Curated annotation (Swiss-Prot):
This is Flagellar transcriptional regulator FlhD. Keywords: Activator, Bacterial flagellum biogenesis, Cytoplasm, Disulfide bond, DNA-binding, Transcription, Transcription regulation. One of its GO terms (biological process) is bacterial-type flagellum assembly. The lineage of its organism: Bacteria, Pseudomonadati, Pseudomonadota, Betaproteobacteria, Burkholderiales. NCBIfam families: PRK02909.1-1. HAMAP family: FlhD. Signal peptide: none annotated. It comes from the Bacteria. It is found in: Cytoplasm. Belongs to the FlhD family. GO terms for cellular component: cytoplasm. Homodimer; disulfide-linked. Forms a heterohexamer composed of two FlhC and four FlhD subunits. Each FlhC binds a FlhD dimer, forming a heterotrimer, and a hexamer assembles by dimerization of two heterotrimers. GO terms for molecular function: DNA binding. Gene3D superfamilies: Flagellar transcriptional activator FlhD (1.10.4000.10).
């Protein structure tokens, strides 16, 4: 298997894992799932209602379906600070993420 083929297979695997996790989060607690993923209600509805066949087809994209929500260097650096305790880091992360805008369908 070539390096490109291997990378595409890994992208597909990550995509499928991400979509399945997203669906599980949304089905168990829609509001919390939307918060954790930073997505709009419209996008949450689309993701939650995908059939298995649609989910697998979408996962087969050659592009990553998830992306870093931490596109601010200072934010990412503060969350990765090894000097903080895990509990403080998680609380700080939740506070910072609550201030991030949700993604919408474009």
């Amino acid at each position: 298997m070539s390096a490109t083929s291997e990378m595409l297979a890994e992208i597909n695997e990550v995509n499928l894992s991400y979509l399945l996790l997203a669906q599980r989060l949304l089905r168990e607690d829609k509001a919390m799932g939307m918060f954790r993923m930073g997505i709009s209600e419209e996008l949450a509805d689309v993701l939650a209602n995908l059939t298995l066949a649609q989910t697998v087809k979408l996962a087969a994209s050659n592009q990553m379906l998830c992306r870093f929500r931490f596109d601010d260097h200072a934010l990412l650096s503060s969350l990765a600070d090894k000097g903080r305790s895990s509990a403080v880091s998680h609380a700080h992360s939740a506070i910072l993420m609550a201030g991030q805008p949700v993604e919408s369908l474009r």
